[in-house]
From Swiss-Prot:
Chain positions found as N6-succinyllysine: K185, K418, K421, K455
Gene: OXCT1
GO molecular function annotations of the record: protein homodimerization activity; succinyl-CoA:3-oxo-acid CoA-transferase activity
Pfam families: CoA_trans
EC numbers for this chain: 2.8.3.5
Its biological purpose: Key enzyme for ketone body catabolism. Catalyzes the first, rate-limiting step of ketone body utilization in extrahepatic tissues, by transferring coenzyme A (CoA) from a donor thiolester species (succinyl-CoA) to an acceptor carboxylate (acetoacetate), and produces acetoacetyl-CoA. Acetoacetyl-CoA is further metabolized by acetoacetyl-CoA thiolase into two acetyl-CoA molecules which enter the citric acid cycle for energy production.
Reaction(s) this enzyme catalyzes, per UniProt: a 3-oxo acid + succinyl-CoA = a 3-oxoacyl-CoA + succinate; acetoacetate + succinyl-CoA = acetoacetyl-CoA + succinate
Organism for this UniProt entry: Sus scrofa
Major location category of this protein: mitochondrion
GO biological process: ketone body catabolic process; ketone body metabolic process
Protein name stated in the entry: Succinyl-CoA:3-ketoacid coenzyme A transferase 1, mitochondrial
A GO CC term assigned to this protein in UniProt: mitochondrion
Record family assignment: Belongs to the 3-oxoacid CoA-transferase family.
Amino acid sequence: MAALTLLSSRLRLCASAYRSGGAWSQGCAGYFSTSTRRHTKFYTDAVEAVKDIPNGATVLVGGFGLCGIPENLIGALLKTGVKELTAVSNNAGVDNFGLGLLLQSKQIKRMISSYVGENAEFERQYLAGELEVELTPQGTLAERIRAGGAGVPAFYTSTGYGTLVQEGGSPIKYNKDGSIAIASKPREVREFNGQHFILEEAIRGDFALVKAWKADQAGNVTFRKSARNFNLPMCKAAETTVVEVEEIVDIGSFAPEDIHIPKIYVHRLVKGEKYEKRIERLSVRKEEDVKTRSGKLGDNVRERIIKRAALEFEDGMYANLGIGIPLLASNFISPNMTVHLQSENGILGLGPYPLQNEVDADLINAGKETVTVLPGASYFSSDESFAMIRGGHVNLTMLGAMQVSKYGDLANWMIPGKLVKGMGGAMDLVSSAKTKVVVTMEHSAKGNAHKIMEKCTLPLTGKQCVNRIITEKAVFDVDSKKGLTLIELWEGLTVDDIKKSTGCDFAVSPKLIPMQQVTT
């Protein structure tokens, strides 16, 4: 008992010395390492915190879109002028903010990311051969970073099997004439329990630039709402992690169970001088807004698809919805039904768009739109989000497509040499055999070009992954061996009409019915 009392007394003395900034006492040293390498170093100037990042370094940069990006640390890199960086980030912000600023200043040599998005300069530099881009599925990117922080050198995943990710040949760098200068390498493939998986290697950075909400004087960190995204796994996956925060508080301000990142991962801390917290897509609703259900059913193509897609929801279901038609279909979920909407940037329990006075830059969906959450919602990191997705815990994923093949192959992420948006989280979303994959799209492309075809001509997002196709003309069930079966047909159209506008053959269900629409 006397020994325990002595230990307790010395622990209190050590904690007191730590809070006051004093040195550890000799008594403390008898119980704890005196190595200063474990102590978080605090900075008052962001430039000082990053000035030793050398040319050619690999830098992990947190954030999703513009949400949770380390604004001050990115600005500091602009001032240091460091060049030839390999930047690992989900995307590259926008043209004039976030990592887009470092692209404009030509400080980045290679991007490892999942999504080009709406950053026109990013896309221009890539297609012009000025920038190397290693496009990586979003969930795979998150897991590669997580593995790097956990000391796992590589892992197997079903994401990307049967695509350019597995086969190799995806352009990393173009020549000036549009030919491929550097192509991705093939991945090793193994089979487990009848399913194919590819080998992905972990990512570790020389430095990680992370944005958090608050830190205490010990270096423990917390995040706010959906701003944790890639920040959390990146914190653990670099030789030197630099965290910028909005506020530094006293030790003891956080309950231990409320700490998101323990101090062991945080090497440097700086309080951000100022924050713009720009919003990429401001989406709001008005007080009087109600679900848009006016007009005759099916009076336009888009509405027709939306109102059929809404019938895919079931009570208690967990669903991930792509931007556009899939997300709009959620407006028609029955009030007698509960559907839990998951967003891959780290939200479970998405709600409607906010009122103007509810807008929060730290709360966005995967489409970078401002959102709200419903009671019972939760926030988590990107690696946790894709554990839900890849692990088959999400019942339904609904997304758009450029092309779908007869046997359920999906293409929706690039047109080589012309359009490069990146795969984002789509490859992960369609990778689990436990998740129903529903494609919503217009039946034909411009010029009546086929989108439903014998074989996709564009690079695949997933192989034999689609279970159902919903267009303005028809609904097909998809079997990976037997092909398509027409199960619903829009009123006024015939089977021959569908044959003319479809680029492959299909069976017709003996129970063919008129195309259904959600009731209003």
